[in-house]
Amino acid sequence: MTMTDPIADFLTRLRNANTAYHDEVKLPHSKIKANIAEILKREGYISDFRTEDAEVGKTLIVDLKYGPSRERSLAGVRRVSKPGLRVYAKSTNLPKVLGGLGVAIISTSSGLLTDRQAANQGVGGEVLAYVW
């Protein structure tokens, strides 16, 4: 069966594993999921990610990050632009997540960027998700 929204599936698996205090999440690999994981690692929401060859295709393994007393570093995730309703933002009207404490992941012509990177480069695009 085909997956309608692989980005939402990725974010949901991350949220569920984080809520259950799992140390890692295994999910099907794709370039966009690896790019989102790279942004989450750079912003400090996950500790690391890697790709492994599976029997069929590749597997993306994301290592979740917790504080010293197991407090979650990933408080929340929300999918914004969906296959049925795409959400775009101009470079002058980029969203702020929790007044700048969170991160908006935006798909631009320059690749996947955070809201701050897109504002610095002066590009807009499709708002994929909010992470805080």
UniProtKB/Swiss-Prot annotation:
Q: Which UniProt keywords apply?
A: Ribonucleoprotein, Ribosomal protein, RNA-binding, rRNA-binding
Matching PROSITE patterns:
RIBOSOMAL_S8 (PS00053)
Entry's Gene Ontology molecular function annotations: rRNA binding; structural constituent of ribosome
For this protein, the parts annotated as crossing the membrane are: none
InterPro entries of this UniProt entry?
Ribosomal_uS8 (IPR000630), Ribosomal_uS8_CS (IPR047863), Ribosomal_uS8_sf (IPR035987)
Q: Which Gene3D superfamilies match?
A: 3.30.1370.30, 3.30.1490.10
Per the UniProt entry, what are the Gene Ontology biological process annotations, in alphabetical order?
A: translation
SUPFAM superfamilies on file:
Ribosomal protein S8
Q: How does it assemble?
A: Part of the 30S ribosomal subunit. Contacts proteins S5 and S12.
Q: Which PANTHER family match?
A: 40S RIBOSOMAL PROTEIN S15A (PTHR11758)
* Function field: One of the primary rRNA binding proteins, it binds directly to 16S rRNA central domain where it helps coordinate assembly of the platform of the 30S subunit.
Q: Which family does it belong to?
A: Belongs to the universal ribosomal protein uS8 family.
Name the record gives this protein: Small ribosomal subunit protein uS8
**Provenance organism:** Rhodococcus erythropolis (strain PR4 / NBRC 100887)
Q: What is the lineage of its organism?
A: Bacteria, Bacillati, Actinomycetota, Actinomycetes, Mycobacteriales
